[in-house]
Structure formats: C-alpha cells, structure tokens
A protein has these predicted regions:
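Non-catalytic signal-transmission and effector/linker regions of two-component phosphorelay proteins
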Residues: 1-5, 11
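Two-component/phosphorelay signaling modules centered on CheY-like receiver
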Residues: 10-32, 39
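Acidic catalytic/metal-coordinating carboxylates
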Residues: 33, 59-62
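Short alpha-helical segment
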Residues: 36-37, 49
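His-Asp phosphorelay/catalytic-motif detector in bacterial-type signaling
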Residues: 45-47, 72-77
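Active-site residues of response regulator receiver
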Residues: 52
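Receiver (REC) domain active-site loop signature in two-component systems and cognate sites
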Residues: 55
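Short amphipathic alpha-helix used as the core "switch/output" element in two-component signaling
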Residues: 61-74
Length: 77
C-alpha cells in the first residue's frame, strides 16, 4: 500500500484530503507545518507528497527545491 504525505496548514483541507486518500486505500500521514514534514522524512520516505504552496513556516516551492537538491528525495513525486 502506498504511503502519501499531506502537507497542508489548513486543518479542514488537510482532513478532507486525508479522508479521501484513506478511503481510496492509501496510507496517509498529514502535517500542518513544513518542520513536521521534514522530521517525518528522516524516518521514512513516502511514495508521494501532496504539498501546499503557502505554509506558515516555509514556502512550498522552497520545500520542493530543497527536496530536489538531496539525492534521497530528488525523485520524490
């Protein structure tokens, strides 16, 4: 079963996305801040990341740049 990380600061949107994905038989971990997401990446890499562009602690575009600059996460969709 695929693991998807949802990174979204709006709690309502995050919950809707999480429920929809779980109902489609995906494993889902959700985060409201980029810092939480980065800590989770240290433990396990997901198969897919759904990433909000505007987060309270970091811009989503900057997160993508950071992921692309590291060999372990370079090809992470």
């Amino acid at each position: 079963m695929a693991l998807i990380y949802v990174v979204e600061d709006d709690e309502n949107i995050r919950e809707i996305e999480t429920i929809a994905l779980k109902n489609s038989n995906y494993l889902v971990k959700s985060f409201g801040r980029a810092s939480e997401f980065y800590r989770a990446l240290d433990d396990i890499l997901p198969d897919l990341v759904l990433l909000d562009v505007m987060l309270p602690d970091e811009n989503g575009c900057d997160i993508v740049k950071r992921l692309r600059s590291q060999s372990a996460t370079r090809r992470l969709p």
